[in-house]
Amino acid sequence: ATADKIPLITINHGRTDTTDGRVFPYIFPLQLNPYSEVSAIVNYIGQQAGGLDKLKGKKITVIYHGSPYGKETIPIIDLLAKKYGFQAKHVEVPHPGNEQQAQWLAIRRDKPDWVILRGWGVMNPVAIKTAHKVGYPANRIIGNIWSNSEEDVRPAGDAAKGFLSITTHPSGTQFPVLQQIKQHVIDPGHGNLPAERFGTVYYNLGVVNGILNVEAVRLAQARFGVKTLSGEELRWGFEQLRFDNKRLKEVGALGLLQPLKLSCADHEGGGAVRLQQWDGQHWQPVSDWIQADRALLRPI
């Protein structure tokens, strides 16, 4: 991307260090990087406990995919454990994660207050089903950004009821931009996906991605002219992204997309999540936007 000067949009994923656009000028982990992800989850757990100071003495276990992605946040969890006084444990699940009996039996013995699931693919429903089998409650498990879709919970059946996860793009069709898509695309039959997919987590991620891309192009063309943009010009457009609540309301995405402010040095721009809970059929929002501790994380 850097050699070719073509922006690479790694929305909600990619290595955390690519957040610094001064070092990685053409990579944009928009909205949420892995460090922000776990920081926001810990902040939510603190909120549920009655304040971050109440985390002292609590037990938080992270069960993670055995890959560089899964391991990336281990030092951040340990840093937050030291800061707030909770006990952190890390449990690895080798890829692909279709056998987790030993890991969840160990978790049950340890009796953590919360489990953070940093999964991938088949690992997610297997984790939920195995937790249920050994008696660990689903409503004390919080899935990360790769453990938050309908596809992650439906295969687990009733065991998934109560399971929590984070999201940067809540499911649902109530947002004005989704209603416009329904009116102009879905209802006239111009869509190319099953109707039940409309408004799901991954569908709404696509909508958010589209909003961010179009806004970056709009800003760049306002500066450089309505033409085919170069990679350098489009990079400039992404670095000018500004979404406050006023602008989010204008594009019909208030509540669907978090407030964002990007810059040359900050290619994430947000660092917030919402919590959602699976009721057996749909995800239900259970929190407003919860911000990561970016002041702590950015120097790292």
State where each predicted segment sits:
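Extracellular/periplasmic Venus flytrap/periplasmic-binding protein
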Residues: 16-17, 25-135, 172-179
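A structural signal for well-ordered alpha-helical segments within the folded catalytic domains
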Residues: 39, 125, 207-215, 232
